[in-house]
Amino acid sequence: MDEDGQVLPQGGEGEVCIKGDNVTPGYENNAAANAASFTDGWFRTGDQGLFDEDGYLKITGRLKEIINKGGEKISPLEVDNVLMDHPAIQQVVSFAVQDKMLGEEIAAAIVLADGASLSESELKTYAQQYLAKFKIPKIITFVDEIPKGATGKLQRIGLAEKLGL
């Protein structure tokens, strides 16, 4: 669905919403959560996605993680997928950092593959081949390990603070 609650055509990217007998009718005793999560009986999952040409649902990211760089909306998952294709990279997580002028800017935490070397400028040159200029991370930090949350999952939100950026 789009931001106005309209169902999008195949290929249109928006929030994944579900409805049916197997979907909860709402949160018990939590009117605020219900108002934020339900629209005309549709449960808003917080996931971003689209139906591909074969009719399969493709999850493209989480709405809370979308980076708003001067009004441009950037999926960190898209940036991750491009950077992960570089042979020197073992793991990557792209995330938002605060920017005085643009509101948010893109950063990426990179774990290099064993024995690999890669400079920030080499990675940016590589990314220019596959990403629009405004989607290339401004800040690239190389780390031995990407911090994880309490559940062991990589968490984009709050990563800038954990890395001191």
Model-derived features with residue positions:
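Active-site loops of AMP-binding adenylate-forming
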Residues: 1-4, 30-33
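Short helix-loop capping/hinge motifs at secondary-structure junctions, enriched
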Residues: 5-7, 117
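Active-site glycine/GP-rich loop and adjacent strand/helix microenvironment
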Residues: 9-10, 26-29
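AMP-binding/adenylate-forming catalytic core of the ANL superfamily
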Residues: 15, 20, 25-26, 33, ...
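FAD-site-proximal beta/loop scaffold in flavoenzymes
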Residues: 41
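General small-molecule cofactor/ligand-binding pocket signal
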Residues: 140-143
